[in-house]
C-alpha cells in the first residue's frame, strides 16, 4: 500500500495522518517535505498519527528522528500518536522511544500542547 497523507490543522497544531508504508523513496521524501513546509511557515506544533502505517524501514525511522530534531531546532514540538505495535517495537529495540513524545490518541497529543503552554 502506497503512503497517503491527510493533513489538517486543529487549534494551531498541524496533524498528519499517515496510511501505508513509510519507506525509502518518495514516501519518506513526502513526509519530510510536509514537515519542512510546516516549519518554513512557522507552524511548529506537529502531530504524526501513525495508526495506519503498515510498514516502516530504517530510512522511515531516520526521517522520524530527523523531523523531531528539525522541529526542536525551530522551537517547536513534534509528537507521535497511535503507534502500531510494529513501530513501537522497532523504536523500543533501537532504544529510540525516549526520543519521541508518544500519545495513545490524537486527542491526548493535542491536549498535551495545551498543558505545556500553561
What are these regions (language model features)?
Residues 1-17:
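Short beta-strand/loop segment at the start of cytosolic alpha/beta domains
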Residues 13-22, 117:
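Short, low-complexity, intrinsically disordered N-terminal segments
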Residues 22-100:
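Amphipathic alpha-helical interaction surfaces in cytosolic regulatory modules
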Residues 85, 107-108:
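Acidic phosphotransfer microenvironment of two-component signaling modules
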Residues 101-105:
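Short acidic-hydrophobic, aromatic-tinged amphipathic segments that line or gate anion-handling sites
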Residues 110-118:
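Short, charged, intrinsically disordered terminal tails
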Amino acid at each position: 500500500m502506497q503512503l497517503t497523507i491527510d493533513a489538517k490543522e486543529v487549534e494551531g497544531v498541524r496533524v498528519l495522518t499517515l496510511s501505508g508504508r513509510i519507506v525509502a523513496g518518495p514516501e519518506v521524501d513526502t513526509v519530510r517535505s510536509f514537515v519542512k513546509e510546516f516549519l518554513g511557515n512557522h507552524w511548529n506544533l506537529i502531530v504524526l498519527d501513525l495508526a495506519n502505517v503498515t510498514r516502516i524501514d530504517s530510512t522511515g525511522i531516520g526521517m522520524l528522528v530527523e523531523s523531531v530534531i528539525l522541529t526542536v531546532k525551530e522551537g517547536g514540538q513534534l509528537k507521535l500518536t497511535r503507534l502500531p505495535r510494529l513501530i513501537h517495537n522497532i523504536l523500543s529495540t533501537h532504544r529510540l522511544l525516549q526520543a519521541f513524545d508518544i500519545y495513545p490518541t490524537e486527542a491526548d497529543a493535542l491536549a498535551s500542547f495545551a498543558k505545556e503552554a500553561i
